[in-house]
């Protein structure tokens, strides 16, 4: 379905409810620049570096896009997805069934669920929705739950230290969204709905989240304007 949620006036903050879940794949593909390109790149990188029969967990898996890409590249991987939206997981299960993918889906709050014994943890555009006081604790839990030499792949919307640069990049990004078919009204509506719900960090703050948790190094695998993917190594 096409994302037209913000064509009408909104009266609440953004949340991953049934309406968002029903249009999520269209929403993210038109809202995150080069989403398909970056998702495929990150999946291929993981497919190359993960050991045989590696255990992978996607936190905030939404409709399982990343997990399905991995399953297509490596059918030996043991895949799990965690999300707190029943509607998202319902769509994820339907897609996994359609593609014949064996994925364990878990309905849970990612800040409270147990994480242990994984070779890779994914969090694509997920940390930005975790309240800042809980974010460092979650990344620490991810680090603790990874096996030796495990990796943490996460993608985030970012801001810059320079406020003028941030403003300019956001303007370019909103032009991009308009080119994807969103009206200026829809863009403004969503921006308002996301206020204080999506809290972005700078590139340095995101790197430090991982480094302070104990990761040895953090590489960047993709970047466009204010969107970025990181790969942290335990």
Swiss-Prot record:
Keywords: S-adenosyl-L-methionine, Transferase. S-adenosyl-L-methionine binds at residues 35, 60-62, 83-84, 109-110, 124, 191. The keyword Transferase applies. Signal peptide: none annotated. One of its GO terms (molecular function) is S-adenosyl-L-methionine binding. It catalyses: prephenate + S-adenosyl-L-methionine = carboxy-S-adenosyl-L-methionine + 3-phenylpyruvate + H2O. InterPro entries: CmoA, Methyltransf_25, SAM-dependent_MTases_sf. SUPFAM superfamilies: S-adenosyl-L-methionine-dependent methyltransferases (SSF53335). One of its GO terms (biological process) is tRNA wobble uridine modification. Catalyzes the conversion of S-adenosyl-L-methionine (SAM) to carboxy-S-adenosyl-L-methionine (Cx-SAM). Belongs to the class I-like SAM-binding methyltransferase superfamily. Cx-SAM synthase family. Homodimer. This is Carboxy-S-adenosyl-L-methionine synthase. It comes from Campylobacter concisus (strain 13826).
